[in-house]
Each structure stands twice: as C-alpha cells, then as structure tokens.
Design a protein with these regions (language model features):
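Amphipathic alpha-helical packing segments from all-alpha helical-bundle domains
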Residues: 64, 82, 94-98, 112-138, ...
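Short helix-capping/turn signature of helix-turn-helix
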Residues: 45, 103-110
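Amphipathic C-terminal alpha-helical segment
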Residues: 91, 132, 153-171, 182-189
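Short, charged helix-capping/linker segments at alpha-helix termini
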Residues: 23-24, 68, 139-146
Length: 189
C-alpha cells in the first residue's frame, strides 16, 4: 500500500521538527515539501497543535518499535543496551538532525498541552525500555533501574545535542565511549 497524504505530511513534519523543533512546523513549508496545498494539511490536522501532537506520537511509537526490534535482533539485554546509542546516532547521520523528542523537550514551555503529553511519552518509552534491559542484564536492582535508565537517556540525548552543535558525529562517539568508560553504559567484553 502506498503512502497517504497524511503519512507524507507526518514524514515531512518529522524531518522539519528534527531540524527546527516545534517552531519549524510551518504549514506552508510542509505543504510545499509534500506538494499539496496548505488547506490539505488542515484537512488532516485542523491545527498546528494537532499536527505537532500527531508527529510526536508517531515518533515515540516508531521509537518503541525500534527498541523492540533492537531487543529481538540483539538477542540479549546487554547487547541491546550497547546498541542503544546508535538509535540517536542515526539522527545525526541524517542531516545532523536531533532527536525530535529532545528538540521538542527543549521547547517544552512553549508547546501546546497535547504536544507536551506526546513528548513526555517519548521519554517514558525510552526510560522504561532501558530500565527493563538494565534489570534483565543484571546490571541494576529493580528499585535502582529507573534512576540509571534516566541517567543513560539524558546522557545520550546530551551527547547528541553537543555533537549536533559542533556538527561532529565523531564527538558523539567519543562521548558515548566516555560514558562506557565511566560505567554509565555497559561495556561488552
């Protein structure tokens, strides 16, 4: 089945939001990118807030699927944890973009409520997944796993932000290696 106009709008909106955040969701610019009239976007998304919420929802849903696939592909929790930073690296590889959840989190005070809710779900999905992997790998006790998961999520998002600000993907790799050497991320032997 081919992509619908709605899918094309959401894909274009995702790229715009990864490069420019919520404020980068310009209806006219998205319409030009997709090759439709701006009114057509309003048919699918009656407001910018609804578009922002829909693109943020799709982003965390895609991330949840990516994390599930990562776990299935790697076969064990420790390997999955060691591959986790690569999810964030892919955004940098794609036009030096930032994780959309991180970008929109930085704009949090200016986001409409429905967008805030979806952005929070992105962080929740990542922290929950990390917490489970940490427990399954035997790296943390259940009562400590969420705290370490938040630290890992925050550190990797921060590494991505710093690498983007320098347009230097190798800096991201260096920071991730540093986190592993410091014991925040597991090292596979």
């Amino acid at each position: 089945m081919g992509k619908t106009s709605r899918d094309e709008i959401l894909n274009a909106a995702r790229l715009a939001a990864q490069a420019h955040g919520y404020t980068g969701l310009n209806i006219r610019g998205l319409a030009d990118e997709v090759g439709i009239k701006a009114a057509s976007i309003y048919y699918h998304f009656p407001s910018k807030a609804e578009l922002g919420a829909a693109v943020a929802q799709r982003y965390w849903e895609d991330t949840a699927r990516d994390l599930a696939t990562l776990r299935e592909t790697e076969g064990d929790a420790l390997k999955s944890l060691s591959r986790y930073p690569h999810i964030f690296r892919r955004s940098l590889e794609s036009g030096n973009r930032l994780c959309m959840g991180s970008f929109m989190s930085a704009e949090y005070d200016d986001l409409p409520e429905p967008v805030k809710e979806e952005v929070q779900k992105f962080a929740d999905v990542n922290v929950a997944w990390l917490s489970i992997q940490l427990q399954e790998a035997g790296l943390t006790a259940p009562e400590e796993s969420e705290k370490r998961a938040r630290a890992i999520f925050s550190a990797i998002a921060g590494a991505q932000l710093m690498a983007r600000s320098r347009n230097d993907i190798h800096l991201f790799d260096e920071l991730i290696d540093g986190y592993a050497q410091a014991g925040l991320l597991p090292v596979q032997g």
